[in-house]
Curated annotation (Swiss-Prot):
Residues 4-255 form the Pyruvate carboxyltransferase domain. Belongs to the alpha-IPM synthase/homocitrate synthase family. This protein is a Fe-Mo-cofactor biosynthetic component. Its EC number is 2.3.3.14. Pfam families: HCS_D2 (PF22617), HMGL-like (PF00682). Disruption phenotype: Fixes nitrogen very poorly; has very slow diazotrophic growth on nitrogen-free agar plates. A double nifS-nifV deletion no longer fixes nitrogen. NCBIfam families: nifV_homocitr. It catalyses: acetyl-CoA + 2-oxoglutarate + H2O = (2R)-homocitrate + CoA + H(+). It comes from the Bacteria. Signal peptide: none annotated. The gene is nifV. This is Homocitrate synthase. Keywords: Nitrogen fixation, Transferase.
Amino acid sequence: MASVIIDDTTLRDGEQSAGVAFNADEKIAIARALAELGVPELEIGIPSMGEEEREVMHAIAGLGLSSRLLAWCRLCDVDLAAARSTGVTMVDLSLPVSDLMLHHKLNRDRDWALREVARLVGEARMAGLEVCLGCEDASRADLEFVVQVGEVAQAAGARRLRFADTVGVMEPFGMLDRFRFLSRRLDMELEVHAHDDFGLATANTLAAVMGGATHINTTVNGLGERAGNAALEECVLALKNLHGIDTGIDTRGIPAISALVERASGRQVAWQKSVVGAGVFTHEAGIHVDGLLKHRRNYEGLNPDELGRSHSLVLGKHSGAHMVRNTYRDLGIELADWQSQALLGRIRAFSTRTKRRSPQPAELQDFYRQLCEQGNPELAAGGMA
């Protein structure tokens, strides 16, 4: 697979995260930022939510962004009609494809689903819209029926089929098998939409790409329904570094858009969140710090330069004397070996007591002053310095 197209759904599925509600300015700012980042497709909203949603979508469509814009619709006349007024060029027409949801959610059967796919995809195409046929709950559906749905949709003019792991129950090996199967049977674009209920959204997305997916759904920071979606930043960096697939995204712009979505959503990014967390390039353990100082690739899997970031070395419970000496040297203080060891003990006690990652410079200087006042315990005991 030489390339993969990102269809980011931060403005649709990301906003469906309980309690998240972007205002118009925030949605426009996020859309601009995603386009400037180089994201080729944006799913920007749900037209059937009402006039206010449609107005914002229309405003985004009027920005002249380089990204293709999509609207998410249920497979029904009302939603398709609403989408036509938003200015988007493509729609995702979504319907359940599992027998479970067809019966218990819609009280319908497979024959009805196939008829509606043919009818509404055809109407969307007549209206001048490109179509992605969204297969809700595809992960729990009969794959032969998913193929049938895809064939009917393609015959009616759809260019793409979206395989949605709606309740997040897929695992990478199963996802790989399903996309290999679909790519053999269907001659159309294939898109994966993964949820993170078992922490596998990004892994499932990568597996789908290995199986033949041409498009992937992502959200910034993994924001989304329940446990969230495949994170844009994770997918972009993993595809590039682990599989040699360049998505065309400006990775140095990722921290800024992560912060933008964090503010707009009110959802704080975890300190250890992969790629964008504040602590993902922070090192404390003495063995790791020593290795980094000798050669950064000793303990570097992801190069922070790709994100415009850098490694950070901090003092704490797991630090070594070498890091203590270097830190005090930066403060203009050269330590003897006994001082390094003594101060390391104080730093470890401080970190355990305060639960902080690193003492501040003033605190380090205070530790040193106290140590100097006490003197060398070995000399005080008559030992050798």
